[in-house]
């Protein structure tokens, strides 16, 4: 039997493509060649949006029946930063002391490589066809604005009649070691700007002005005084975090006319975006009373909260993890947003990949042994899923 490529070799080929978002730099070509060679039907789809870069995406499928398991991910990466600070080139794909270095080694070219390697090995051992369908849904638009990637690729697939039963996103879900965490959900994210209007004037004549600075400080305190909630069965409490306060005033002798404070809320499944906004605005009105003039400008958001309830699918993935690592993974909903939020509208989805400790850092790296373990876990998922 001809041997299939290893996760390490695939990961190195991907890392050597400098696909800093929104550039593809040949990364999807690497995947297309491998998947076509294994019998997948591969589609390359480019999406556009005014004011954003055109993005190349890939959808590949083998099989045409249920059950249908999808592997999803992104080949774009964040910039490497100071190239001279890297021990090994950010796009060299070097291995040293058992570690694979490169931008995207963890987030998330390494995870994609493991999924592809596991799938090719599984197909080679099972007559080249699954007892159902396997697909890969890969975008080059996750690390930036995320408008021409997964969300549109899912819509495109649905219009073609594609139906997914379950999905694994290969994001670096583990905290410290392979097998410690499966992400089964993510909090929603909503940003806004609190704006307080005053009356500009000379500091020597405060009675002729209305200073918005003390008022915005009062409102920030008021909005943070009471928790938004106390958490839920699967989520930690929602959190409102102010991130900047600005008055745009370079002078020391002028009372500003307006003060603005930016904030972000990470919210759990007690809220929708609409009910969350209503709650915050209700508290703002109460804090303003009859004197302070303030309002909130809400920024657009496509980051809704989602959760995949523990059940047969999470048990299946957990069993594959336990077989390789002898660990029982924690089912977790912490962290930031990911493209899984879009996929959750189409099927049950979990995130499981490499260890995320060095993602987005100088010298991003992963142990080669972790690539081997993750490949074995994905292989175990496939065996169980199509049993």
Swiss-Prot record:
Keywords attached to this entry: Amino-acid biosynthesis, Cobalt, Diaminopimelate biosynthesis, Hydrolase, Lysine biosynthesis, Metal-binding, Zinc
Free-text remark on how the cofactor is bound: Binds 2 Zn(2+) or Co(2+) ions per subunit.
Record field: catalytic activity: N-succinyl-(2S,6S)-2,6-diaminopimelate + H2O = (2S,6S)-2,6-diaminopimelate + succinate
Superkingdom of source: Bacteria
Enzyme superclass (EC): hydrolase
An annotated GO BP: lysine biosynthetic process via diaminopimelate
UniProt cross-references to Pfam families, sorted A to Z: M20_dimer (PF07687), Peptidase_M20 (PF01546)
EC numbers: 3.5.1.18
Protein residues bound to Zn(2+) 2: 107, 143, 360
Cofactor(s) named in the record: Zn(2+); Co(2+)
Binding site for Zn(2+) 1: 74, 107, 171
Molecular functions (GO terms): acetylornithine deacetylase activity; cobalt ion binding; succinyl-diaminopimelate desuccinylase activity; zinc ion binding
Gene3D superfamilies: Zn peptidases
Assembly and oligomerization: Homodimer.
Family: Belongs to the peptidase M20A family. DapE subfamily.
Role according to the record: Catalyzes the hydrolysis of N-succinyl-L,L-diaminopimelic acid (SDAP), forming succinate and LL-2,6-diaminopimelate (DAP), an intermediate involved in the bacterial biosynthesis of lysine and meso-diaminopimelic acid, an essential component of bacterial cell walls.
This protein's name: Succinyl-diaminopimelate desuccinylase
Naturally occurring in which organism (per UniProt): Rhodopseudomonas palustris (strain ATCC BAA-98 / CGA009)
Name of the gene this protein is made from: dapE
């Amino acid at each position: 039997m001809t041997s299939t490529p290893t996760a390490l070799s695939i990961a190195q080929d991907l890392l050597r493509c400098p696909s800093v978002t929104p550039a593809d730099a040949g990364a999807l070509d690497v995947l297309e060649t491998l998947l076509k060679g294994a019998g997948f039907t591969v589609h390359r789809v480019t999406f556009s949006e005014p004011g954003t870069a055109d993005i190349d995406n890939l959808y590949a499928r083998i099989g045409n029946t249920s059950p249908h398991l999808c592997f999803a991910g992104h080949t774009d990466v964040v910039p490497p930063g100071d190239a001279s600070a890297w021990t090994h080139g950010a796009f060299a794909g070097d291995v040293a002391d058992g570690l694979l270095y490169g931008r995207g080694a963890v987030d998330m070219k390494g995870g994609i490589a493991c999924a592809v390697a596991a799938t090719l090995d599984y197909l080679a051992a099972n007559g080249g066809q699954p007892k159902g369908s396997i697909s890969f849904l890969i975008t080059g638009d996750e690390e930036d604005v995320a408008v021409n990637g997964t969300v549109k690729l899912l819509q495109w697939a649905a219009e073609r009649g594609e139906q997914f039963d379950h999905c694994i996103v290969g994001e670096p879900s583990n905290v410290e070691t392979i097998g410690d965490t499966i992400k089964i959900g993510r909090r929603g994210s909503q940003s806004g700007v609190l704006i307080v209007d005053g009356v500009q004037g000379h500091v020597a004549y405060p009675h002729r002005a209305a200073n918005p600075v003390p008022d915005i400080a009062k409102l920030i305190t008021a909005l943070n005084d009471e928790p938004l909630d106390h958490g839920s069965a699967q989520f930690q409490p929602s959190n409102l975090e102010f991130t900047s306060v600005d008055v745009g005033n370079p002078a020391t002798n002028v009372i500003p006319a307006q003060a603005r404070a930016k904030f972000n809320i990470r919210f759990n499944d007690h809220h929708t975006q609409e009910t969350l906004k209503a709650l915050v605005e209700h508290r703002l009105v109460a804090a303003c009373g009859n004197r302070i003039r303030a309002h909130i400008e809400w920024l657009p958001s496509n980051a809704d909260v989602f959760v995949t309830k523990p059940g047969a699918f999470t048990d299946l993935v957990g069993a594959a993890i336990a077989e390789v690592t002898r660990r029982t993974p924690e089912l977790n909903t912490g962290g930031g947003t990911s493209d899984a939020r879009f996929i959750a509208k189409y099927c049950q989805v979990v995130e499981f990949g490499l260890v995320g400790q060095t993602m987005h850092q100088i010298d991003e790296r992963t142990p080669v042994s972790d690539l081997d373990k993750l490949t074995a876990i994905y292989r175990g998922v496939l065996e169980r899923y199509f049993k």
